[in-house]
């Protein structure tokens, strides 16, 4: 699991390889990831936008942004959490993702919350250390 805490908003990400949706012979590798956002602050916040920076093992970068997550702009009161799952296809057997959520308070103050960097590695990927 990967965690980041920004202004008492905790974001936890757990990636997992989806072998049944992947086809290595066709250079298609697919991961899912589960995100849990916990509002540990004393004010309500709404997730209004997302931004992802995705890099495959060849250095190819893909940037994804848009309103909310999975079609929602969830509002989290103090102490509440929101969980969702999504996915990411790559043409290579490994990569890395990180990003941010734009949050808004009930007073219309906006701020960014970090999504921690997390690795996307196929289970059979061998690491070579020199």
Curated annotation (Swiss-Prot):
Residues 3-127 form the ApaG domain. Gene3D superfamilies: ApaG domain (2.60.40.1470). Disulfide bonds: none annotated. This is Protein ApaG. The lineage of its organism: Bacteria, Pseudomonadati, Pseudomonadota, Alphaproteobacteria, Hyphomicrobiales. The gene is apaG. NCBIfam families: PRK05461.1. Pfam families: DUF525. HAMAP family: ApaG.
């Amino acid at each position: 699991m990967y965690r980041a805490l920004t202004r008492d908003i905790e974001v936890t990400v757990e990636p997992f390889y989806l072998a049944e949706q992947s086809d290595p012979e066709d250079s298609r590798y697919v991961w899912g990831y589960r995100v849990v956002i916990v509002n540990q602050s004393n004010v309500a916040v709404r997730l209004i936008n997302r931004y992802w920076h995705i890099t495959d093992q060849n250095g190819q970068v893909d940037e994804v942004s848009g309103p909310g997550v999975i079609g929602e702009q969830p509002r989290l009161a103090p102490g509440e959490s929101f969980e969702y799952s999504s996915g990411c296809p790559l043409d290579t057997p490994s990569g890395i993702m990180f990003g941010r959520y734009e949050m808004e308070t009930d007073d219309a103050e906006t701020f960014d919350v970090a999504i921690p960097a997390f690795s996307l590695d196929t289970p059979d990927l061998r690491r070579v250390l020199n």
